[in-house]
Design a protein with these regions (language model features):
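Structured alpha/beta reader/binder surfaces that contact nucleic acids or chromatin modification marks
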Residues: 1-137
């Protein structure tokens, strides 16, 4: 099942350009099929779904210092930002990004996905990658 997350513009740009290949989160969607599902991204501060990416796998990690040592380049955020987020968690999941693209026409989260607010972590959606592929930039 596809999911929706919210990210700031600079991280969306890094994901689509290939500079950021790992998204780290406190959890992962258990009903997500890496072979066919995708993650839609809402730009933080807006109602617009502007991009999507596919995930190759989810990896569990428990030590933020080791995560930073091993994956700092792929994570694509400064150390202080990472540690401000990471110190609050006991478990971390690395979402390995396989491919990403901007949507040609941004989608309104309410009209297209039926969401009234931007998700804090992630939410499931019935909207599919096939729908989005017609809107690729």
């Amino acid at each position: 099942m596809n999911v929706v997350i919210t990210l700031p513009r600079n991280l969306i740009t890094a994901i689509v350009s290939g500079a950021k290949t790992i998204e780290f989160r406190k959890s992962y969607p258990k009903d997500f099929d890496c072979r066919q599902d995708c993650v839609f991204v809402i730009e933080k501060g807006t109602r617009n779904v502007v991009a999507y990416f596919c995930v190759s796998d989810f990896q569990y990690e428990s030590n933020p210092v080791e995560i930073w040592r091993d994956y700092s380049i792929q994570i694509g955020v400064p150390f202080f930002w990472f540690m401000a987020y990471a110190h609050r968690c006991r478990a971390y999941y690395l979402w390995r990004i396989r491919k990403a693209a901007y949507l040609y026409t941004p989608l309104d989260r309410g009209l297209s996905l039926g969401l009234t607010t931007n998700p804090q972590s992630y939410v499931y959606t019935q909207y599919t990658c096939a729908h989005a592929s017609s809107d690729l930039r």
